[in-house]
């Protein structure tokens, strides 16, 4: 084989490798799947229970009460699918729930190894196909772009969490739609209004640490094909601001098809949302071109202090709530504004009861209620 032949083969191999992802991009805007809006009727909710095997016993114990509270609120109207690391953890969780007088009738346990608790980002995405069959999509999870642990200086490991969608699909006998080679996308990076509009920050999607070289047009084509969304509200976001590169669901979500739930401008600025993004958010339009109504919820009055007395140095957001069948689980912080926020959010859901969930210790690790829940529609 001469040098010229080797050179040509090398060029061809490189060309094919570089274009693999482009070949897999949707070439049309045909809608193959539609994601039910979060507030539609649930079969259940998925939780990945904290354990000791990645971050230790103190981490696990600090988060247990939040998971017990969420389970207690959810079991009254839907299944709670609890992912336990192993049988020892399952037995421990059952003991915790029994101690808290949580009935186990609606609790379903799965034993899967996990790395952490963020099922919104790594968990199954349930969608309906053209025949109205419920299937599971696996969008891949690489730890928000292969992030480095600040304390250890090592790559954060999420190989176990990345397998959760396929394990659930196998156990449930559901079709798995593997989107890993097309796009990497966390559940918390997108919110949808239930009427064809998706809102997201570019920083957590059009980022080389997830989707190298992907354009906005390509991302929109994927979201149209696989989630059924045709109208897009893009904020720039800020790459590197925190571990997620600024997920949208921390500061802006859809309350319903006509309402965006967010904060006043000063609170958004305090929450590190850029002024240019605030302007885009407030100017957002529905699929039909009309404006949304805005429901604005304040930040906490004070900086969040964990249950062990650690002052985090920043305020808490109430936007990252979760809508269950007959409850709305709202992050709470032992703050005077808990009651204010709960009351404001309650006005949007008159047929559901708002339940405050203490997330102070979870918030220290970057998340709230929506981040650690994942709905399974009927």
PLM region descriptions:
Residues 26-378:
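The feature marks the mature, well-folded catalytic cores of soluble enzymes
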Residues 14-32:
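Bacterial Sec-dependent N-terminal signal peptides
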Residues 1-5, 19:
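Positively charged n-region of N-terminal signal peptides that target proteins for export
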Residues 5-14:
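Bacterial N-terminal signal peptides
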